[in-house]
């Protein structure tokens, strides 16, 4: 089974990650405010201390972030990009402008990452 990484466990991300865990998947989570991710341990989640740690251990990375700035900060960071596995998949479910999604998609595809 592929490891799933989930970044952003706020109002929408928490229940989404919880449902993935309840479906039996192995999920590693990261949130800037660690206290928002901690309760997911009760459902079997592993808490990552950094984005780099999370993506290094994940085949699929799901992001549920607040806005364009947050997505740009994560998906554009060296920590994120340099630790992704080749041929892994990034699913951004954040509320962002189409241009933001397209730009990150092009960047990730150029690195052999599915988006």
Predicted regions mapped to residue ranges:
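NAD(P)+-binding Rossmann beta1-loop-alpha1 motif at the extreme N-terminus of oxidoreductases
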Residues: 1-63, 83, 87-88, 93-94
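Rossmann-fold NAD(P) dinucleotide-binding segment
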Residues: 51-63, 67-114
């Amino acid at each position: 089974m592929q490891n799933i990484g989930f970044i952003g466990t706020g109002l929408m991300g928490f229940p989404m990650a919880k449902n993935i865990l309840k479906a039996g998947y192995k999920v590693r989570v990261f949130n800037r405010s660690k206290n928002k991710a901690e309760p997911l341990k009760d459902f079997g989640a592993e808490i990552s201390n950094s984005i780099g740690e999370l993506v290094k251990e994940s085949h699929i990375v799901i992001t549920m972030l607040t806005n364009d700035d947050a997505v740009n900060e994560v998906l554009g960071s060296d920590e994120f990009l340099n630790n992704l596995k080749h041929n892994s998949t990034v699913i951004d479910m954040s509320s962002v402008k189409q241009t933001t999604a397209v730009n990150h998609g092009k960047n990730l595809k150029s690195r052999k990452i599915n988006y």
